[in-house]
Amino acid sequence: MTTLKTHIEFDTNLARWLNVQEVALVREDLLPNGGGKKRRALAQFVTELEDVKHIHLLSYAGSHTAYTLSSLLPDVMIHLYGTHYGGGLYEKEMTSMLDSRANIIQKVSSSWTMSLAFNRQRRESRPGHHFMRIGGSLGFDFSTQSAVEETIRTVGEDFHHVVAVASGDLLTSVARQTNQVTGVLTQPLGIRILKYISLKKSSGIWKSGLNKRIKTMRAVREITGQTWDPIFMGTLFSYLIKKKKLPPKLCIWITCPAGIDW
């Protein structure tokens, strides 16, 4: 069993909307501190930091990882080098939310500008400063792997798992346990192409525009009563409704933070 509980729900209304037999939802958004896709891995990550007072992260503006870290490590300053990604009101809401956190210093600009700033600081690294991998990727972690195993035991091996892909860590963890998985790419086009080439089981190199994703997530909210984000989950659900034929049983991983009204 995992230290953090695995929340699994079955939703007949979503199944009807997607025209499939069954839909199971893995509700990572219900994990503590707002949840989200890296919540399990971050729980382990924070225990491995010694004498660290500053964490530097190059990711998207209003990063979910920075959002979670600020709660888990209230005495550590999080330096976010945030890149614009065309997220509309959701990007503005997340950016504003992080700006209001006392232990987050957020700079936002183009990918090129923020990459230069991040790498310049890394070259000048001082004791007490930790620089995360680009995008906040944490690689393999046993907690997430355990949650994947528990989910498969609960829903059965005939469910096809669908995950939103940013770094690809979750997709890799699920793919270790089953071939029945699709990772829906969510990044800007250039990164999507690179991930499509490098990540097995990835799909969705062409994603819907933001307005379409927002419309999709409003429809999902009408069905589920949940406000999930239009960037990651919006890309995932837009991908699913565009598919002419889906596996009859879907296990969808909800990996955005909870409680963000956009």
Question: What positions do the PLM features span?
Answer:
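PLP-dependent amino-acid enzyme catalytic core
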Residues: 1-262
